[in-house]
Amino acid sequence: LLDAAGLAEKEPNITGLGAIFVSSTSIVNYRLVTEKMAEEFCVLGGYIAMDTEVTHLIEKSDHIDVQCHQKIALGSSLKNRDYVAKFLITCSGLIADRVTKMLNIDTEFQIIPYRGEYYRLQSQHNNIVNHLIYPIPDPELPFLGVHLTRMIDGSVTVGPNAVQGWKREGYGKVNIDLRDICDMIMFPGFWRVSAKNLKTGLIETKNSWWKPGYLKLVNKYCPILKVKDLEDYPAGIRAQAVLKDGSLVHDFLFAESPRSLHVCNAPSPAATSAIPIGDYICNKVRDKTLTLVSDAN
């Protein structure tokens, strides 16, 4: 634990009453990690079908039929592509609820998209912090707050916020999708979570469009930054599971059928914990398949 003086010694540009210093904290390039995992998966005999949409899942006694549409290279037309799985694992993110519904799994949640918008500091501020800086988050919300991150390339990013999205894969401020909107307004949990967090939601929306409002969040702990220091940076989409009663799911959420297991909600630190989460899933699938074999015998 650091008091104000200890914080100032480690981070001269950060102000606060105190801080928790975690010496083991670090970052990685998740794109490179993912690419390497994909490479090793393919070496072991795996196959990754790109530009492929799952359209139907049909569970039978001894397998699951996976029906897909795949975009043809150098064209926009689609071709049918089907797979057969003895056991199916899905980590479907923004369409996790729709995938579980394909198998008629009774779930009480829906995925609501929240856009996380970032800025990058101008290069002269690459040394503004020595560590990763996180504010104290709101315990009522599963978001970490706008923080400063020193990236692998030496740059520093600011963010993210959490803005209600109107398209599940809408990375721009004005992206909308009628199907996604209809799904949301027909889901009672959407209205309840919106009512519970109305003030916060309005502030997040305002700050999304008004950069000084966004900057104010950072200035609480890094007062030397100015609006001109914030450069545009790609946004991300958080696939947030919301229950019918309007509760935001703060923890991991899984759903299953006899021959499938679905990761329905994976909050931070899901990427950091990806390998142990994978171990957990493998162990759970191993237990389920052993049960299937035992029942068959």
Question: For the regions a protein language model found, what residue spans apply to each?
Answer:
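Active-site catalytic microenvironments for nucleophilic, acid-base chemistry
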Residues: 40, 102, 284, 288
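Non-transmembrane alpha-helical segments in soluble domains
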Residues: 38, 100, 215-219
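C-terminal catalytic lobe of FAD-dependent flavoproteins
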Residues: 184-295
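Flavin (FAD/FMN) cofactor-binding and adjacent substrate-gating region
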Residues: 1-50, 56-69, 174-193
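Generic secondary-structure signature for well-ordered alpha-helical cores
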Residues: 12, 42-46, 59, 105, ...
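General beta-strand structural signal in soluble alpha/beta enzymes
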Residues: 1-3, 48-50, 90, 158, ...
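Conserved active-site and cofactor/substrate-binding residues in soluble primary-metabolism enzymes
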Residues: 28, 32, 91-94, 143, ...
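Flavin-dependent oxidoreductases
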Residues: 57-177
